[in-house]
């Protein structure tokens, strides 16, 4: 049972992203790296869902009848393609401003997405269950990562899939994701990341195992400055992505 006195909410993180919420859908703005990163993670998510859940990869709507939760959805950069692929999508974020931006953009594009201003632990108490949960670039922004994994795992159906993308706690990640991206290249606003919140893959795997989730695949995602693109990699020292299945 989830302890109601604990929270995943880090108000300083919520305030930070609320201040720049208007930038979510600007591919040349403060979320430019995420827009560039998105095609790589989308391709991986689509490929693995089709493989693990035996969906037709060439179908226009391979995710039809699948219920997907994108927790920490921001402005909806993942929710919208999931909806276009046929999924029933719930997008949850602790920032009301983010959710307002997401709702407006979905309406402008004729997409039906269930957006909610809430936290993982609050949503978990409602008893809703999902086939897929996306925890993308969010675990490094929560106040209590143990509670966050516990709450999201609780909402996943047996044999359901959880995708987690985050940053490794290495000097290389500190140098590239914080010093490089925030202070030198100014790709991200200063203060976007806190190195102390970065997780090593083994730490995240242990947390998942404690909540009946087994990692079935893992990849690194690296930036290529020569062609200004993000690609899958064996190098998990900076950005990495885990796929876990619930027993």
Swiss-Prot record:
Pathway(s) where this gene product acts: Cofactor biosynthesis; ubiquinone biosynthesis
EC nos: 2.1.1.222, 2.1.1.64
Alphabetical keyword list: Methyltransferase, S-adenosyl-L-methionine, Transferase, Ubiquinone biosynthesis
GO terms, molecular function: 2-polyprenyl-6-hydroxyphenol methylase activity; 3-demethylubiquinol 3-O-methyltransferase activity; polyprenyldihydroxybenzoate methyltransferase activity
Thylakoid among keywords: no
Residue positions binding S-adenosyl-L-methionine: 41, 72, 93, 136
UniProt enzyme class: transferase
One record GO biological process: methylation
Pfam family, one: Methyltransf_23
UniProt catalytic activity: a 3-demethylubiquinol + S-adenosyl-L-methionine = a ubiquinol + S-adenosyl-L-homocysteine + H(+); a 3-(all-trans-polyprenyl)benzene-1,2-diol + S-adenosyl-L-methionine = a 2-methoxy-6-(all-trans-polyprenyl)phenol + S-adenosyl-L-homocysteine + H(+)
Gene3D superfamilies tied to this protein: Vaccinia Virus protein VP39
InterPro entries to which the protein is assigned, alphabetical: SAM-dependent_MTases_sf, UbiG_MeTrfase
Function recorded in the entry: O-methyltransferase that catalyzes the 2 O-methylation steps in the ubiquinone biosynthetic pathway.
Family affiliation: Belongs to the methyltransferase superfamily. UbiG/COQ3 family.
Protein name in UniProt: Ubiquinone biosynthesis O-methyltransferase
Organism: Bartonella henselae (strain ATCC 49882 / DSM 28221 / CCUG 30454 / Houston 1)
